[in-house]
Design a protein with these regions (language model features):
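Histidine-acidic metal/acid-base catalytic patches
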Residues: 1-36, 99-101, 157-179, 183-261
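Active-site-proximal loop/turn and secondary-structure-junction residues that shape catalytic pockets
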Residues: 16-18, 44-46, 70-73, 109-111, ...
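N-terminal substrate-binding region of glycoside hydrolase catalytic domains
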Residues: 29-46, 68-73
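Conserved beta-strand positions in the central sheet of alpha/beta enzyme cores
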Residues: 41, 66-68, 104, 142, ...
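Active-site-adjacent beta->alpha loops and helix N-cap segments on the catalytic face
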Residues: 46-56, 113
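Short hydrophobic interaction/assembly module
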Residues: 54-81
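Active-site acidic/histidine proton-transfer and metal-coordination neighborhood
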Residues: 59, 78-176, 186
C-alpha cells in the first residue's frame, strides 16, 4: 500500500463502513464525520428516511459523493426508459436536498435474446436523455461497470472499455464513468490499459482490494501502480471506500493507515 493513498480524498460507503456507528443510518454519517471524513456515500436513498439523512448531512457539513439513481431496472431495454428518466428526475431532486454530487447509473442485466450492440446503444440513448435532466439540476451521472465473475452474474456492462465507448457516444461532459477498481481487476482488466484513453471521463472511483473485496492491503492489488494509473487518467476526485471490512470500521481504517505509513 503506497503512502500516496492517504493523500487522496476518501469517501466511505456507509452501507458497509460505520455500520457499527449507531442504530440508525444517519448515525453512520455522524460517525464518519467524527472520524474526520468530509465526504460520504451510500447505495440508495429510497430505503432510508430522507428527512433524517438530510438533517444529519446538514448537521455534519458533509458532502455526498454519490448514490444510486432509482429505480435501477434494465436500461438496455428501451421500453424501460420512461420509467428510468422519471426516476432520474426524482433522484436529482433528492441529490439537491442531500448535497450529492453524482447519481450512479447501472445498466441492469443482459437481455439474452437481443443483440449486444443494440443493448449498448440503448444505454447511450437513455444516458443522453438522463444527462440533459441532470445538467439542469447541476448533478453528475456516473455509469458503473460491474464484475460478472464473482458478484453480479448476468449484469450487462462488465467492461470498462465498453462503458467508455458508450460515454463517448453520449458526449456529455457531466455523464462520466464510475471506475470501480475492484470490479475492473476481478474482470481481469489492467487498470493502466483501460484508463489510458479515459482522460476527463472518470467521474468517480470506488476501491476495494481483490480478491475478497476487503480493505486495501488485504488482497493482491498493486496499489502504487493502480493509483498512479488513476492519476495519469486525470482523475483527482474522491476515492469511494466501498469495501467489506474484515474488522470494525475504525480498525480497518487504522490498518490502512498503518500499512500506508
Amino acid at each position: 500500500m503506497p503512502p500516496d493513498l492517504l493523500s487522496w480524498q476518501l469517501s466511505p460507503c456507509l452501507e458497509w463502513l460505520f455500520a457499527d456507528g449507531g442504530a440508525e443510518f444517519p448515525d453512520r454519517i455522524r460517525a464518519a464525520a467524527q472520524a474526520g471524513f468530509r465526504q460520504v456515500e451510500f447505495w440508495t436513498a429510497g430505503n432510508k428516511d430522507v428527512a433524517h439523512l438530510e438533517a444529519a448531512i446538514d448537521e455534519c457539513g458533509v458532502t455526498v459523493t454519490a448514490f444510486v439513481s432509482e429505480p435501477t431496472g434494465r436500461i438496455v431495454d428501451p421500453s424501460t426508459h420512461n420509467m428510468f428518466l422519471e426516476g432520474v428526475e426524482r433522484s436529482c431532486s433528492l441529490a439537491k436536498r442531500l448535497h450529492a454530487q453524482n447519481l450512479i447509473v447501472v445498466s441492469g442485466d443482459t437481455l439474452p435474446a437481443v443483440d449486444r450492440r443494440a443493448q449498448s446503444d440503448a444505454i447511450a440513448v437513455a444516458l443522453d436523455q438522463a444527462g440533459a435532466i441532470a445538467e439542469r439540476s447541476g448533478v453528475g451521472l456516473v455509469l458503473e461497470p460491474l464484475n460478472t465473475r464473482v458478484d453480479h452474474a448476468g449484469y450487462f456492462l462488465e467492461s470498462t472499455e465498453e462503458a467508455l465507448r458508450i460515454l463517448r457516444a453520449v458526449g456529455r461532459p457531466t455523464v462520466r464513468l464510475l471506475y470501480d477498481l475492484y470490479h475492473s481487476v476481478v474482470m481481469g482488466e489492467d487498470p493502466a490499459t483501460v484508463l489510458r484513453d479515459a482522460r476527463g471521463m472518470v467521474g468517480h472511483v470506488h476501491i476495494a482490494d481483490a480478491p475478497g473485496r476487503h480493505e486495501p492491503g488485504t488482497g493482491k492489488i498493486d496499489w502504487r501502480r493502480e493509483l498512479d494509473a488513476l492519476r495519469a487518467s486525470g482523475y483527482d476526485g474522491a476515492l469511494g471506500l466501498e469495501y467489506v471490512p474484515t474488522r470494525g470500521t475504525e480498525s480497518s481504517l487504522a490498518f490502512i493507515r498503518r500499512i500506508a505509513g
